[in-house]
UniProtKB/Swiss-Prot annotation:
Tagged with keyword Transmembrane helix: no
UniProt subunit comment: Homodimer.
Record-given protein name: Glutathione S-transferase Mu 3
Superkingdom of source: Eukaryota
Chain's role: Conjugation of reduced glutathione to a wide number of exogenous and endogenous hydrophobic electrophiles.
Gene3D superfamilies in the record: 1.20.1050.10, Glutaredoxin
Family: Belongs to the GST superfamily. Mu family.
InterPro entries: Glutathione-S-Trfase_C-like (IPR010987), Glutathione-S-Trfase_C_sf (IPR036282), Glutathione_S-Trfase_N (IPR004045), GST_C (IPR004046), GST_mu (IPR003081), GST_superfamily (IPR050213), Thioredoxin-like_sf (IPR036249)
Enzyme class: transferase
Domain GST C-terminal: 90-208
Keyword Protein transport: no
GO terms, biological process: cellular response to xenobiotic stimulus; response to bacterium
Length: 218
């Protein structure tokens, strides 16, 4: 029986999950909820089901895999990572995985806050100034490794790809000074399953955010 992934009809918090499901050749189907337009941003499609799915903490995204029902995007990624042995093999690798998972969430939230702010245009210049330092930290953490934990792909590579690609969309030149990050993105996109998925009709790179945001809604 295929797994069910539920989320808005956007990239949002599920891009890395979708990529990981494809990479692991998992059998899954999506329930994509549509949000209404301004000013009400009607969420009735989701709210009508929210408390009827048996979720401990009803939220989007959710993953239902038989008797396992998981919410919170990183919990879903960890679940899939454990299922497919993509959580790191040594203690050093697992530390790197845990560290990067949380760092990506910080970096994601920072972008979400500015993009969803009514003062987006005022805040954008200052935010752009801070991007090089953020990318420098990722570049130094990756170093000469092919993947962020080491020599093998782990689930945090899917998170890292997602956030670096989002920042690249937001500021196309932000990775120009970091060839190892550009190489990482190209290496990831070159993975056989990922490349095939990106060419398919299932691939959803945009919109990045729901309609309440000031950027990334097209």
């Amino acid at each position: 029986m295929p797994m069910t992934l539920g989320y808005w009809n956007t990239r949002g918090l599920t891009h890395s999950i979708r990529l990981l499901l494809e990479y692991t050749d998992s059998s899954y189907e999506e329930k994509r909820y549509v949000m209404g337009d301004a000013p009400n941003f009607d969420r009735s499609q989701w709210l009508s089901e929210k408390f009827n799915l048996g979720l401990d903490f009803p939220n989007l995204p959710y993953l239902i895999d038989g008797s396992h029902k998981v919410t919170q995007s990183n919990a879903i990624l960890r679940y899939l990572g454990r299922k497919h042995n993509l959580c790191g093999e040594t203690e050093e690798e697992r530390i790197r995985v845990d560290t990067l998972e949380n760092q990506v969430m910080d970096t994601r939230i920072q972008l979400m806050i500015v993009c969803c702010s009514p003062d987006f245009e005022k805040q954008k210049p200052e935010f752009l100034k801070a991007i090089p330092e953020k990318m420098k930290l990722y570049s130094e953490f990756l170093g000469k490794r092919p993947w962020f934990a080491g020599d093998k792909v782990t689930y945090v590579d899917f998170l890292a790809y997602d956030i670096l690609d989002q920042y690249r969309m937001f500021e196309p030149k932000c990775l120009d000074a970091f060839p190892n990050l550009r190489d990482f993105l190209a290496r990831f996109e070159g993975l056989k399953k990922i490349s095939a998925y990106m060419k398919s009709s299932r691939f959803l790179p945009r919109p990045v955010f729901t309609k309440i945001a000031q950027w990334g809604t097209d």
